[in-house]
């Protein structure tokens, strides 16, 4: 895909004013672009770094058209906007990310079928439309398996683990509320992710492979570079995905590595991702920089340089309560507080990145600091 480059001083519209929108806006502004953000929350984080703010719901057609009329290009920070609404916007306005990826990825079943058709390795799965399909899941997948809603759900929401017959009732409850997907539960050795930007003329730029740890289904920590030799294999899988899904901008593919050292594609985030936040300090370009370059039609760097290994820690509300008094004592902690008005224990309130020559020692230091809040 080839499209015109935006000149300095052009206006970028962002649908979604959370922390991702905020960091997109900051990258856009340092490149000389103006930013208009649309979000339903009057005190969303991006509002305070944008040139203009439109307070409206994401399905407010009038407000979305207002955004389109004000901007030379539109991007979005999350995948929960209506795919149909986005398709209509794409017909009238310049939205390089497009709607196709959103349309595919909002449905877990379609996502997995697309990934499988693309030739990537995915965890065995089946469609579960009604309670009787659970028997098929038991027969096909065996215990344990996970039941996930087809639509919605993030940070572990909308899913239940079925270890044995005693857990089936929880699976039935979920199926009563939504069509679902059942997938085999893996004995996971490690979780990794690969952040990628696709730009003008199908330029592809890869970030280093990221090693992730989740706690309570929320990203807890990212280490870069990943301490496992899976970069080439992950890139091969991502290249297959790129051939199957239209997308311009930054996106992330999450992987599982099982106890047999097999790499499986888990899911795709069609926008900058939490596990790529380290790139702001640790790389010569951040994932937000390359995203803005891509959606404005600029050339991408041929490669991303990791300036120094890094450990990135998410900061939840409970972590801020524990660590607030320590931040000033650690200038090596690159701190990002998102500016959310309401602090909740399990809400992402910020992140911090530590550049280090010894990720193992820094990891242990972080465990010691964070253990009181987990």
UniProtKB/Swiss-Prot annotation:
SUPFAM superfamilies: Glutathione synthetase ATP-binding domain-like, PreATP-grasp domain, Rudiment single hybrid motif
TM annotation in the entry: none
The protein, known as: N5-carboxyaminoimidazole ribonucleotide synthase
Record pathway: Purine metabolism; IMP biosynthesis via de novo pathway; 5-amino-1-(5-phospho-D-ribosyl)imidazole-4-carboxylate from 5-amino-1-(5-phospho-D-ribosyl)imidazole (N5-CAIR route): step 1/2
Known partners and oligomeric status: Homodimer.
GO MF terms held by the record: 5-(carboxyamino)imidazole ribonucleotide synthase activity; ATP binding; metal ion binding; phosphoribosylaminoimidazole carboxylase activity
Its job: Catalyzes the ATP-dependent conversion of 5-aminoimidazole ribonucleotide (AIR) and HCO(3)(-) to N5-carboxyaminoimidazole ribonucleotide (N5-CAIR).
Disulfide pairings: none
Organism expressing this protein natively: Staphylococcus aureus (strain COL)
Keyword annotations: ATP-binding, Ligase, Nucleotide-binding, Purine biosynthesis
Binding sites annotated in the UniProt record for ATP: 108, 148, 153-159, 183-186, 191, 214, 266-267
Record Gene3D superfamilies: 3.40.50.20, ATP-grasp fold, A domain, ATP-grasp fold, B domain
EC number: 6.3.4.18
Family, as annotated: Belongs to the PurK/PurT family.
GO biological process terms held by the UniProt record: 'de novo' IMP biosynthetic process
PROSITE patterns tied to this protein: ATP_GRASP (PS50975)
């Amino acid at each position: 895909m080839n499209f015109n480059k935006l000149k300095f001083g052009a206006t970028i519209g962002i649908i979604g004013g959370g922390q991702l929108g905020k960091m997109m806006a900051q990258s856009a502004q340092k490149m000389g672009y103006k930013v208009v953000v649309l979000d339903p929350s009057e005190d969303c984080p991006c509002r305070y770094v944008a040139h203009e703010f439109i307070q409206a719901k994401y399905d407010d057609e009038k407000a979305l058209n207002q955004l389109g009329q004000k901007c030379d290009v539109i991007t979005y920070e999350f995948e929960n906007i209506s795919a149909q609404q986005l398709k209509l916007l794409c017909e009238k306005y310049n939205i390089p990310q497009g709607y196709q990826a959103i349309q595919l990825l909002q449905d877990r079943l379609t996502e997995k079928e697309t990934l499988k058709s693309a030739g990537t390795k995915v965890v065995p799965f089946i469609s579960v439309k009604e309670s009787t399909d659970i028997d098929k899941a038991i027969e096909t997948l065996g215990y344990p398996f996970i039941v996930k809603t087809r639509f919605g759900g993030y940070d572990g929401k909308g899913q239940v683990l079925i270890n044995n017959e005693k857990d089936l009732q929880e699976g039935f409850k979920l199926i009563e509320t939504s069509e679902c997907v059942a997938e085999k539960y893996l004995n996971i050795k490690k979780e990794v992710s690969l952040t990628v930007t696709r730009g003008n003329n199908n330029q592809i730029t890869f970030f280093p492979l990221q090693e992730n740890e989740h706690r309570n289904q929320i990203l807890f920590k990212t280490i870069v570079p990943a301490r496992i030799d899976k970069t080439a294999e992950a890139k091969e899988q991502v290249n297959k995905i790129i051939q199957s899904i239209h997308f311009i901008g930054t996106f992330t593919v999450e992987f599982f590595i099982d106890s047999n050292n097999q790499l499986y594609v888990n899911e795709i985030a069609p926008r900058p991702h939490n596990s790529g936040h380290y790139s702001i300090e640790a790389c010569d370009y951040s994932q937000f920089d390359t995203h803005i370059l891509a959606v404005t039609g600029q050339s991408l760097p041929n490669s991303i340089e990791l300036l120094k290994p890094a450990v990135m820690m998410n900061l939840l509300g409970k972590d801020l309560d524990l660590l607030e008094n320590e931040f000033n004592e650690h200038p090596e902690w690159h701190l990002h507080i998102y500016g959310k008005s309401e602090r909740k224990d399990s809400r992402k309130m910020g992140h911090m990145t530590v550049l280090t020559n010894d990720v193992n020692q820094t990891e242990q230091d972080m465990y010691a600091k964070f253990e009181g809040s987990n």
